């Protein structure tokens, strides 16, 4: 893995913004939450286009995502969060299946332009993971790290890791239902149930996802956007 020179694309890659699943605490999909008048998913699309990316798609079965000027890949995602720590379905099934190189971006993340640039410029011939990492930037919202996405060139490796992650879940090998961190532990061959903050690309600015109204207020009132 290394950073490519600015503006150099080593291979054609699609960017998929993941907007599936159900979060019952939200009246509408939280990827549609407006930050200073702009839906989060629209902001991500805009930042990608400003950085020179045109092959962009959204995965969702919700009709509201048809209006953003990019392809919508209709893909059933039965992951359902219905409480603070309660969920059903399999989170790892949310990645649109394809043999092509794809960068999967989580749709509820408020990305900075620099974060998008870092993701674009990171080269890999396998799979790379992006998340925040301590020590956190002063403008970062949360006291813990959050995941932002995966860049996948070796889809075979990635799909095998997803299936292994699901198998380990059934076997009770995880301390919780597996999400991005657990999937990355399997992809990278790391220790299960332990976050290694050194084996992925850390993005340390205000980039973060939204989980509750306080997160929204943080971004709406922040002067850094």
Features from the language model and the residues they span:
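C-terminal catalytic/acceptor-binding lobe
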Residues: 198-225
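A short, N-terminal amphipathic alpha-helix
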Residues: 38-54
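N-terminal nucleotide-binding beta1-loop-alpha1 segment
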Residues: 9-28
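Short phosphate-binding loop-to-helix
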Residues: 66-103, 110-113
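Active-site metal-binding loops of divalent metal-dependent hydrolases
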Residues: 22, 108-109
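N-terminal amphipathic/hydrophobic targeting modules at extreme N-termini
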Residues: 2-9
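Conserved core of the sugar-phosphate nucleotidyltransferase
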Residues: 111-204
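Short, polar loop motifs at secondary-structure junctions
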Residues: 59-65
């Amino acid at each position: 893995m290394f950073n490519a020179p600015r503006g150099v694309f080593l291979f054609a890659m699609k960017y998929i913004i993941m907007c599936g699943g159900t979060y019952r605490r939200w009246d509408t999909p939280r990827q549609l939450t407006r930050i200073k008048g702009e839906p989060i998913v629209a902001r991500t699309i805009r930042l990608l286009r400003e950085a020179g990316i045109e092959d962009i798609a959204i995965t969702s079965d919700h009709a509201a995502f048809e209006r953003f000027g990019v392809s919508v890949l209709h893909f059933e995602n039965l992951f359902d969060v219905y409480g603070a720590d309660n969920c059903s379905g399999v989170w790892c099934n949310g990645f649109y299946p394809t043999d092509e190189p794809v960068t999967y971006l989580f749709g509820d993340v408020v990305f900075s332009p620099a974060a998008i640039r870092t993701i674009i410029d990171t080269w890999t011939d396998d799979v790379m993971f992006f998340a925040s990492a301590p020590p956190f930037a002063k403008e970062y919202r949360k006291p813990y790290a959050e995941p932002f996405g995966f860049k996948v060139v070796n889809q075979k490796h990635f799909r095998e890791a997803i299936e292994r992650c699901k198998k380990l879940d059934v076997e009770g090998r995880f301390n919780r239902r597996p999400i991005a961190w657990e999937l990355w532990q399997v992809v990278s061959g790391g220790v299960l149930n332990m976050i290694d903050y050194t084996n992925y690309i850390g993005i340390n600015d205000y980039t973060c996802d939204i989980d509750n109204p306080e997160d929204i207020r943080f971004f709406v009132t922040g002067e850094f956007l």
